[in-house]
Amino acid sequence: MDRFPRSDSIVQPRAGLQTYMAQVYGWMTVGLLLTAFVAWYAANSAAVMELLFTNRVFLIGLIIAQLALVIVLSAMIQKLSAGVTTMLFMLYSALTGLTLSSIFIVYTAASIASTFVVTAGMFGAMSLYGYTTKRDLSGFGNMLFMALIGIVLASLVNFWLKSEALMWAVTYIGVIVFVGLTAYDTQKLKNMGEQIDTRDTSNLRKYSILGALTLYLDFINLFLMLLRIFGNRR
């Protein structure tokens, strides 16, 4: 007699969650690899670097396009097909690579690599915490979101003020915020994954990519904040 009967209603949601989270991290990794490749390739292209550094309209257009893609993916996910969702995420990752290519001009390759490793370690630890903790992190959501808005506004103000003190304050606060968001977003995605029907492969793909985009943004922003702190300028 089986003393510990296994109920399908228990086993299937757990298996579905694991499938969903595996795809989230998988697509996030694909996005990061594409971003890294495009950034490296663009940094080694004199034509692309000249375009980025001399054509302000192109750079502003690039940033607007990135914001538009995030809004479309977040707001219209239910209306998009799995194929279009995948294409838009890949496009966003590539455009981010173009935007970030300048870091190879500003910082040494060794410091970029070491900062990436540090970021991966911090991200992994906090994502693991968010996934495994029994503590409900939803209460931190509003606080982290308000802090994020504060960081964005302070960064915009400092674009004109050029205050080094404000820049460092934003940087260190930003590290704390994105570390917290990593744990918060991971738990939120875990809760979402428990509700997803993995038999609907199209829906699974779309929401896996949406989750990947969320964690991708946390990782990229944490990396940029840490690079300001640990990066060695050329």
Swiss-Prot record:
Record membrane topology: Multi-pass membrane protein
TM annotation in the entry: 24-44, 57-77, 80-100, 103-123, 137-157, 164-184, 207-227
GO molecular function annotation: calcium channel activity
Assigned GO CC terms: plasma membrane
Cytoplasmic side: 45-56, 101-102, 158-163, 228-234
Location in or out of the cell: Cell inner membrane
Family matches, as InterPro entries: Bax_inhibitor_1-related
UniProt keyword annotations, A-Z: Cell inner membrane, Cell membrane, Membrane, Transmembrane, Transmembrane helix
Pfam families: Bax1-I
Disulphide bridges, residue numbers: none
GO biological process, one term: regulation of proteolysis
Topology feature Periplasmic, residues: 1-23, 78-79, 124-136, 185-206
Family statement drawn from the similarity comment of this UniProt entry: Belongs to the BI1 family.
The name this protein goes by in its record: Inner membrane protein YbhL
Lineage per the UniProt record: Bacteria, Pseudomonadati, Pseudomonadota, Gammaproteobacteria, Enterobacterales
